[in-house]
């Protein structure tokens, strides 16, 4: 009887080795070893990155299907110390795909099944690196998934169209004119300008049926408490 891998046990292992985008060395090694132990053809360092792909080939011609999971963790600061944490669930995605690999390794009769473990989903660059590496060149169907804590497990959710929009990061530097807080009319406070930008971005009249979101996720400004701020940096 075939022994399938337990996704929970895989997740427990992966959850203890969170790594940031393009730094998933331990994770990639864990994935590659697991695939190799299953007897699955394994490609590593895809496109010169930490990307890994397992390939299960059927004995007859047929479609090429690719299943994809991301591997990277998110950067956090705890007690003043930077660290990586699997706060977006990519460890569970990787665990689930490895569990699928153990179930599918003897089930593919026609065509080919590719199992892609992508680096740097959070940094966006990972997807481009995988495309440049040619992982999609012969693929007929590509599928992926993402856990949703707000979604009931029993219900599930499948969408034939767009479910999540692509992301883009914008960095804005605002330069003003410093002045004493008691005489704000003599300066240009970049905090005020930054707040105005944030409010106006949120006030854009987009079609509510469209999938979109625009958010300021960081705001940095440094000055003495008695002076208006000369420079501010926004990220969104």
Question: Model features per residue range: what roles?
Answer:
Residues 19, 24, 121-122, 234:
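Acidic-residue sensor for enzyme active/binding pockets
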Residues 1-87, 91-110:
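Acidic/His- and Gly-rich active-site-bordering loop/insert found
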Residues 52-55, 74-87, 91-92, 107-226:
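Histidine/acidic-residue-rich, glycine-tolerant segments that coordinate divalent metal ions
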Residues 71, 135, 232:
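Hydrophobic pocket-lining residues within nucleotide cofactor-binding pockets
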Residues 11-15, 174, 229:
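General secondary-structure edge motif
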Residues 229-236:
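Single conserved hydrophobic/aromatic residue that forms the stacking wall/gate
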């Amino acid at each position: 009887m075939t022994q399938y891998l337990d996704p929970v046990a895989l997740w427990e292992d992966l959850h203890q080795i969170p790594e940031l985008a393009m730094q998933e060395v331990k994770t990639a090694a864990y994935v590659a070893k697991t695939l190799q132990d299953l007897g699955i053809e394994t490609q590593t360092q895809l496109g010169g990155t930490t990307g890994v792909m397992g390939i299960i080939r059927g004995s007859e011609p047929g479609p090429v299907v690719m299943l994809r999971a991301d591997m990277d963790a998110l950067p956090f600061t705890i007690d003043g110390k930077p660290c990586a944490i699997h706060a977006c669930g990519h460890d569970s995605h990787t665990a689930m795909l490895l569990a699928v690999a153990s179930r599918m390794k003897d089930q593919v009769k026609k065509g080919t099944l590719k199992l892609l473990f992508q680096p740097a989903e959070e940094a966006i660059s990972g997807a481009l690196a995988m495309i440049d590496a040619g992982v999609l060149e012969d693929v007929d169907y590509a599928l992926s998934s993402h856990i949703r804590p707000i979604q009931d497990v029993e219900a599930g959710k499948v969408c034939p169209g767009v479910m999540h929009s692509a992301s883009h990061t914008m960095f804005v530097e605002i330069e003003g004119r410093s002045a004493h807080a008691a005489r704000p009319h003599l300066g240009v406070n970049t905090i005020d300008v930054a707040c105005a930008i944030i409010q106006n971005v949120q006030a854009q009249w987009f079609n509510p049926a469209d999938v979109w979101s625009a958010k300021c996720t960081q705001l940095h400004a440094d000055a003495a408490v008695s002076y208006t701020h000369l420079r501010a940096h926004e990220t969104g």
